[in-house]
């Protein structure tokens, strides 16, 4: 059975959500949302397949406010950003 994007994201959320956690950005205790470290629209623009867009290495948990604030931008200060960009570029 092929696992689609929504199923994989849902399974990841089930494992990592459900209780309030401390948001790594604002350090407040809040319910978390799933954020893509490298935004999906950028992965699509460079021509990566859907599997790369659903790479669990590219997921992080942020509170709703921080997730909305980050939006579709890349946070170059995030410790996973450069390794993920290298990984995805090398896969082209």
Regions found by a protein language model. Name each.
Residues 1-9, 28-29, 82-92:
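A boundary/linker detector
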Residues 27-58:
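Histidine-centered nuclease catalytic patch
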Residues 1-22, 50-53:
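Short, charged surface segments at domain edges that flank catalytic/cofactor-binding sites
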Residues 56-81:
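Short Cys/His-centered divalent metal-binding micro-motifs
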Residues 20-26, 63:
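Short cysteine-rich clusters marking metal-coordination/redox-active sites
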């Amino acid at each position: 059975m092929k696992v689609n994007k929504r199923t994989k994201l849902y399974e990841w959320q089930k494992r990592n959500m459900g209780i309030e956690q401390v948001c790594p950005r604002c350090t407040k205790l809040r319910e978390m949302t799933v954020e893509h470290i490298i935004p999906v629209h950028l992965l699509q623009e460079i021509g990566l397949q859907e599997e790369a867009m659903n790479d669990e290495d590219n997921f992080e948990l942020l509170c709703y406010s921080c997730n909305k604030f980050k939006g579709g931008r890349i946070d170059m200060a995030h410790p996973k950003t450069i390794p993920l960009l290298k990984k995805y570029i090398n896969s082209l």
